[in-house]
């Protein structure tokens, strides 16, 4: 019932989004730092549930990240919950190339995208869909959550394909005011009547003609 009530809410009042669970996708090449990558995966997984996915073209990096996850889990305060989250929603994927890693990351349209490659800016140009992007080894998601400045309310579940993070714009309401002179309307008339006829809305067309035929 809670989910139904939440979905019905926008009928009466707009909300920012229905966000969660938390997500991270990490794109790394052979230069990626396994300790940093593991730390960021755990930082998302400890939300429990939270998904954490590594896409790397380097099998060696993948192996070292798996080892780092185990050693870090052993001393993590929420270790059991985090391990359960990783087992259910985590993955280490070895891709065939850096291009494939970027393509998969873009398809996932994740909430948080971390790029730990030799040239993160070059990787970034292949990405169109992500809630927030963290470039290079010294840009952990936690910095974005708490101090670096971007919104902490970000699109999840693939909605970064069409949505952005919460901003001040969510609290603003815009409108449109149109005033045309007769010559302006005449210049638009052909387009208006074509579209109106296509939709079968003849009264729309005639509302324009009434002003121009007299």
Features from the language model and the residues they span:
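A conserved active-site cap/scaffold subdomain adjacent to cofactor or substrate pockets
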Residues: 14-88, 92
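C-terminal core of ALDH-fold dehydrogenases
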Residues: 98, 106-214
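Short acidic-hydrophobic sequence patches enriched in Asp/Glu that either
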Residues: 1, 57, 61, 163
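Phosphate- and divalent-cation-binding pockets in alpha/beta enzyme and binding domains
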Residues: 64-65, 103, 122-123
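Glycine-rich, Lys/Arg-enriched anion-binding loops that position phosphate/diphosphate groups
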Residues: 73-114, 118-119
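Short, small-residue-biased leader/transition segments that mark boundaries at the very start
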Residues: 2-9
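Solvent-exposed alpha-helices and their adjacent loops that cap or buttress functional pockets
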Residues: 8, 15-20, 34-36, 44-48, ...
């Amino acid at each position: 019932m809670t989910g139904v009530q939440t979905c019905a809410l926008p009928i009466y009042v707009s909300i920012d989004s229905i966000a969660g669970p938390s997500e991270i996708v990490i794109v790394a090449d052979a230069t990626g730092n396994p300790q940093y990558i593991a730390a960021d995966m755990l930082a998302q997984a400890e939300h429990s549930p939270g998904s954490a996915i590594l896409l790397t073209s380097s099998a060696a990096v993948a192996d070292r990240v798996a080892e780092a996850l185990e050693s870090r889990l052993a001393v993590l305060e929420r270790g059991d919950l985090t391990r359960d989250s990783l087992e259910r929603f985590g993955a280490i994927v070895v891709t065939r190339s850096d291009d494939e890693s970027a393509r998969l990351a873009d398809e996932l349209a994740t909430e948080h995208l971390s790029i730990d490659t030799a040239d993160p800016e070059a990787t970034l140009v292949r990405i169109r869909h992500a809630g927030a992007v963290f470039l290079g080894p010294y840009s952990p998601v936690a910095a974005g959550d708490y101090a670096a400045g971007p919104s902490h309310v970000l699109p999840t579940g693939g909605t970064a394909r069409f949505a952005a993070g919460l901003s001040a714009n969510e609290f603003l309401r815009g409108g449109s005011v149109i005033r045309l002179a007769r010559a302006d309307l005449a210049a638009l008339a052909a387009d208006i009547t074509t579209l109106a006829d296509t939709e079968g809305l003849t009264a729309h067309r005639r509302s324009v003609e009434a002003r121009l035929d007299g």
